[in-house]
Design a protein with these regions (language model features):
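Active-site cores that bind ATP or allylic diphosphates and position pyrophosphate for catalysis
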Residues: 1-86, 144, 153, 160-161, ...
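Extended, domain-scale alpha-helical bundle/helix-rich regions
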Residues: 94-196
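Auxiliary tRNA-acceptor-end handling modules of aminoacyl-tRNA synthetases
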Residues: 286-287, 301-304, 324, 333-339, ...
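Flexible, glycine-rich loop/tail regions that form catalytic "lids" or insertion modules at the edges
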Residues: 62-110, 132-134, 149, 261-263
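Short acidic (Asp/Glu) and glycine-rich catalytic loops that position anionic groups and cofactors
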Residues: 21-31, 64-67, 85-89, 96-103, ...
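Zn2+-dependent metallopeptidase catalytic domains
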Residues: 80, 84-87, 95, 129-135, ...
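C-terminal, non-catalytic macromolecule-binding modules
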Residues: 224, 229-308
Length: 370
């Protein structure tokens, strides 16, 4: 009988939400109404209206009594789940839309390469509780790594390419080598990679004056080219600005992967692609959208723009990938060796490949932000 603060006693259905909630559940056959924790205080009114309906509608065919059950809302670190805040991100142009791979939306996660199985696996692991908490984003990333490790095709991609010349390898010669699509799947096929005199390696895999515990390519040191030969670095070439533009090495013909001599102890292994038949691709490296672990709480004192991670997207425009990736399709998943898990973006075209990083191979965020 308490009057509504605006309409007074004109309508006898106040509070409207509580009246409608239980009534619609009763008549529509809803047995369990699952709500988040803020609705717990509404449950007495929900029960009151349902019990009242059972009395005033004794002939109703329902042989059940709807129940309201509350559980915690899903909150992730470095993420905002509020639709109002997500809308603000879209409207202010901080993201490319609701399906931006940094958004915690279903379409955003799909575009980034998250599988339905990985999301369900994550939900199964965290369960639900009766108190509000915040789940570490690393758990979601672990779930997708675990799933993609089983299903992703392995391939090589060099994001920051530098030319490697094998000086004692015959010019014009090419070798075909077999590469397993997925070592985790005994039934998976293999694909061919071509080895030649000139390759591309990651620029960070070469250092001219390397520290003692640097096991990748440096003058005088041996390194294994994955699935190929052991090579010894002999030097490099620089441009007028002092930047390394070519690296030189000599290979040992007896160390082809699978031969007895290939078991020689070499501490460093790096990936590569052929300079002649690799294809160019754009690679989008996504990371956490916010720098604060709990942006919803931090947002009470800071503006949304102050909380954004300026490095949440880095675009690599001239990466080189294996030629079979030119036939990549949406809905397929790939592991770029030593780099991370990737999928083809809808922006991709036959003449301009675009790959999105789903997640890195390891959780580097905590290591960097310690």
């Amino acid at each position: 009988k308490v009057p509504h603060h605006r309409t007074g006693t004109k309508w006898g259905v106040y509070p409207m939400y509580d009246f409608a909630h239980g009534q619609s559940d009763f008549f529509e056959g809803v047995t369990h109404s699952i709500c988040t924790l803020e609705f717990e205080v509404h449950r007495p009114l929900y029960d009151y209206f349902v019990d009242l309906l059972k009395k005033v509608e004794p002939d109703h065919e329902a042989n059940y009594r709807p129940r309201q059950i509350e559980f915690n809302r899903l909150n992730l670190t470095y993420t905002m789940m509020s639709k109002r805040k997500l809308l603000q991100l879209v409207q202010e142009g901080h993201v490319a839309g609701w399906d931006d791979p940094r958004m915690p939306t279903v379409c955003g996660l799909r575009r980034r390469g998250y599988t339905p199985e990985s999301i369900r696996g994550f939900i199964d692991k965290i369960g639900y509780t009766k108190y509000d908490g915040i789940i570490d984003m690393a758990l979601l990333e672990h779930a997708v790594r675990e799933d993609l490790n089983r299903r992703a095709l392995r391939g090589s991609a060099v994001l920051d390419p530098i030319r490697l010349v094998i000086t004692n390898y015959p010019e014009g010669q090419t070798e075909e080598m077999s590469f397993l699509n997925n070592p985790e799947d005994p039934e998976s096929d293999s694909h061919i990679i071509r080895f030649s005199r000139e390759l591309f390696i990651e620029a960070e895999d070469f250092m001219e004056d390397a520290p003692k515990k640097y096991f990748r390519m440096t003058p005088g040191q041996e390194v294994r080219l994955k699935s190929a030969y052991i090579v010894r670095c002999t030097g490099c070439k620089k441009d007028a600005d002092g930047r390394v533009v070519e690296v030189y090495a000599e290979y040992d013909p007896e160390t082809l992967s699978g031969r007895p001599e290939s078991n020689r102890k070499v501490k460093g292994t790096i990936h590569w692609v052929s300079a002649t038949d690799s294809v160019e691709a754009e690679v989008r490296l996504y990371d956490r959208l916010f720098v604060d672990e709990n942006p919803a709480e931090a947002g009470k004192e800071k503006s949304l723009s102050e909380l954004l991670n300026p490095d949440s997207l880095r675009i690599v425009t001239h990466a080189r990938v294996e030629p079979f990736l030119a036939e990549a399709k949406q809905g397929e998943y790939y592991q770029f060796q030593r780099v991370g898990y990737f999928c083809l973006d809808p922006d991709s075209r036959p003449d301009h490949l675009v790959f999105n990083r789903t997640v890195s191979l390891k959780d580097t965020w905590k290591k960097v932000n310690k």
